[in-house]
A protein has these predicted regions:
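Internal active-site segments that recognize and position negatively charged phosphoryl groups
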Residues: 136-164
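Short glycine-rich anion-binding loops that position phosphate/pyrophosphate groups of nucleotides
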Residues: 70, 128, 153
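Short, charged beta-turn/beta-strand-edge "cap" motif at the junction between a beta-strand
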Residues: 127-128, 240
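Short, solvent-exposed secondary-structure boundary/capping segments
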Residues: 117-125
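Short, charged/polar, Gly/Pro-enriched secondary-structure boundary elements
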Residues: 129-133, 260
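Glycine-rich, charged/polar anion/phosphate-binding loops
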Residues: 132-133, 141-144, 172-174, 184
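A glycine-rich beta-to-alpha transition motif near the start of alpha/beta enzyme domains, typified by
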Residues: 1-117, 156-265
Length: 265
């Protein structure tokens, strides 16, 4: 007699510059995706991840992906998560391009290289939207940042040195009334004419080692501010990505398949 649970959820775990995701077929779950995402992402009692990309069939794209953060909130898009989805697709079929539907529209990922389980993609992230600069004033935190939308909201703060306690500041900024849906917060230090270093507080996740859309937003804000020129090397704790702004914003970086398994429900 089997002692295993009757129901399991198959998953693939992938990482893009230390930003890790679980890739799961949406049809594997009949219940609440938000609650199941929280359970799956729990690093002590679940599999552990920054988010879950739930996959569904799509008439126009190779696949449709709905992204849920570790706290169960649904997000429009993750550049790193989209590359992780593309890596799963790339492991299943020979194709130089993958078209993925996200909450921020259709995104094309072009395969530029592969080394074992690591896939290198350039993703067309579309046009940035720049609402302008905004000053945030609150007890203990004062910051002037550039607002950038890459299909999801970002607030980019330029610093010479990353401040002590930036994680707490990022959390306070991310939940300000000025951002009704919350925002992602990036602290950016310019280290060369084509290079920046970033720290990231992601809405619905917290501190992360990397962010694809955060890298794009940071590079765009730096280019607009004439601090750097395209293409921009973006250095994060989890790795390096390259952002090119040529009409659309293009994001180049790796995605690595980590493992496959089953989650007992």
């Amino acid at each position: 007699m089997s002692i295993l649970p009757a129901r399991t959820i198959p998953f693939t775990k992938a990482s893009a510059c230390g930003n890790d995701f679980l890739i799961v077929e949406g049809g594997a779950v009949s219940g609440d995706l938000a609650e199941m995402s929280r359970r799956l992402c729990d690093r002590h009692n679940g599999v552990g991840a920054d988010g879950v990309e739930w996959l569904f069939p799509d008439d126009e794209a190779d696949i449709a992906a709905r992204l849920f953060n570790a706290d169960g909130s649904e997000a429009e898009i993750s550049g790193n998560g989209t590359r992780c989805v593309a890596a799963v697709l790339g492991s299943q079929k020979e194709s130089a391009e993958m078209l993925i539907r996200t909450g921020a529209g259709l995104k094309t990922c072009r395969l530029t290289g592969r080394r074992g389980a690591t896939f290198e993609f350039e993703a067309d992230m579309g046009d940035p939207i720049l609402p302008g600069e905004l000053a945030i004033e609150m007890p203990g935190v004062g910051a002037v940042g550039t607002q950038v939308s890459m299909g999801n909201p970002h607030f980019v703060v330029f610093v010479d040195v990353f401040p002590d306690g930036w994680q707490r500041q990022g959390m306070l900024i991310a939940t300000q009334p000025a951002f009704p849906q919350g925002t992602n917060v990036e602290y950016v230090s310019v280290i060369g004419p084509k290079e920046i270093e970033i720290r990231l507080f992601e809405r619905g996740v917290g501190e992360t080692r990397s962010s694809g859309t955060g890298s794009c937003a940071s590079a765009v804000a730096a280019i607009v501010g004439r601090r750097v020129s395209s293409p921009v090397k973006v250095v994060a704790p989890g790795g390096v990505q390259t952002v090119r702004w040529d009409g659309h914003v293009y994001l180049q970086g790796p995605a690595t398949l980590i493992c496959r398994g089953e989650f007992f429900v």
